[in-house]
Amino acid sequence: MNGKVLPDTPIAVDCWQLRKCLHVRLFFLSHMHSDHTCGLSSTWSHRPIYCSPLTAKLLRLKLQIKQKWIRPLEIGQDHMLMLDDLGKERLTVNLIDANHCPGAVMFLFQGYFGTRLYTGDFRYTPSMLRVPCLQNHINIDVLYLDNTNCDPTRALPSRQQATQQIKQIIRDHPGYAVVIGLYSLGKESLLVDLAMEFKTWVEVDRERLETLRVLQLPDVFTTDSGAGRIRVVNQSMISASNLMAWNKLQSTIAILPTSRPMVSCHPNVYVVPYSDHSSYQELEDFVSALSPISLVPIVGNCLPYFSSLLSPRKKPKAVVIPESVKQYMMTNSNIRSSTNGMIQRTSRPEVRGVVFDSPETKLSQPNHDDMDSNDTEIDHDTTDRNSDSDCILLDMGTNSYHRDNDQGNKRLKLIRIESEDVVTVTSSLTMDDNESVSTRKGIGSPDPSLIYECDHESPTKSSKEKSPEMGSTNSGEMCSSMDSMHDQTSLTTAAALTLPNPQSVTSAIPITLESEQFEHWLLENFTIPAEELKEGQVLRGLCENYRLNPVDLPKPVGDPLEAAIKRLMSN
């Protein structure tokens, strides 16, 4: 999730993980893309959400957020918000058009903490620097920068150039139907431009049409099948089977406007580098023009590229939090559960399950009851590998891992241990005969048989994006990183690879225990080094040597695990 809690303030932007925001009182939303709304749902009832007027409408349409929690702020105006309960400290915020997707804005914050500019996702244009709030050589203390395309080796064309490339592809295929793969929001101006150029209706589904009506775009869209030459589908619909079916009815080409480094493997699929994020050169121009004192990347690390562009005149100053703001940040936030509306306990529940942990690092679980007020001043924008546990915890207690006798479903709860809290990632994996977890990888992405993503690692990708144990708390990303484990025939028995001292086992478990009870004990006590889990070696090693089954499935005669237990206990 691309969001931040601004340190030394009660402010969060695009961050909806409430356990990380216990001291936050002002929530801001830059735009409506799903990676910036993760954790936000119709049950939100905690604090007002500040956003642009258009994003406010989309919040109501797409997430059904109650109107009383939405606070639209006009773009280009100064807005004053209270930072305490006494009216002593105030915040001035100005919204700037981010040139990214409909309703997307940047936030310029000014207060006791100095001046901070949060870009959210944006595509830089020189006109941004001419808005009144950025004129007169304003000093930016901290710039939170969207560095999605922060790769000096990749050149991206402007959106106008990419649009011309798409138009030329369509001209080169007269009589062909055109299918364009997009996400649910964004690139609407491209569709309007193509409709005007080729004088045709653009066919969309009903859900997208509802969004387009909210955006009040020109009337060039329809839901009537076959009414126009151009049709918009979700990117995941661009598949070999669909292309074959479409071409049986009419000659069809597919176009994917994306900044992701992809190469088409199909003669009728065209990948065009159309991006709503700033190119590296544009980022360099933007940072150079603002010359901020310090820079915080939103997506990953980019300081090696921009350190020379930071202001040489000043050094970051220490922020002194006013006492009234401290009290405001410590006030009970009355955070409620997003599922059943019940008030959550402030104390951390005891975690149960199999802990995958490095032998060198002992798992420590902080308790909210022992935390003092200084916890609210933790810098959430810095990544400290020593502060975050490098393990994933699989909670296989009786309440979270069970077999449904009627459906045969399994539900697995993945929990990530962090320095401040335990973030529960609910991965309700429903298994049936027709779908495995591995088939869920492609949801929302084009068919890999048609295109492949270039083996090109961007400098913006942080270490947290590369390993499951230090990955994003987004449930989809974490679960996909575990696919190599789920795809094997056994999940729970992975814990049996690294065995403890046999003497400690026999002393802790009486010989009279049945093998299944012993197996449960193994799963609750064995550890696997995080580096082995990261490389996916654990399960592959097990499957090469044993025919292992999950504990709640029938065991074959002569199960090697039972034999291993007997050997272990005989030592």
Swiss-Prot record:
It catalyses: a beta-lactam + H2O = a substituted beta-amino acid. This is 5' exonuclease Apollo. Its EC number is 3.1.-.-, 3.5.2.6. InterPro entries: DRMBL, RibonucZ/Hydroxyglut_hydro. Interacts with terf2; the interaction is direct. Its main location: nucleus. It comes from Danio rerio. 5'-3' exonuclease that plays a central role in telomere maintenance and protection during S-phase. Participates in the protection of telomeres against non-homologous end-joining (NHEJ)-mediated repair, thereby ensuring that telomeres do not fuse. The keyword DNA repair applies. It is found in: Chromosome, Telomere; Nucleus. The TBM domain mediates interaction with terf2. Residues 346-386, 431-487 are annotated as: Disordered. It comes from the Eukaryota. GO terms for biological process: double-strand break repair via nonhomologous end joining; interstrand cross-link repair; protection from non-homologous end joining at telomere; telomere maintenance; telomeric 3' overhang formation; telomeric loop formation. Residues 367-386, 453-468 have a biased composition (Basic and acidic residues).
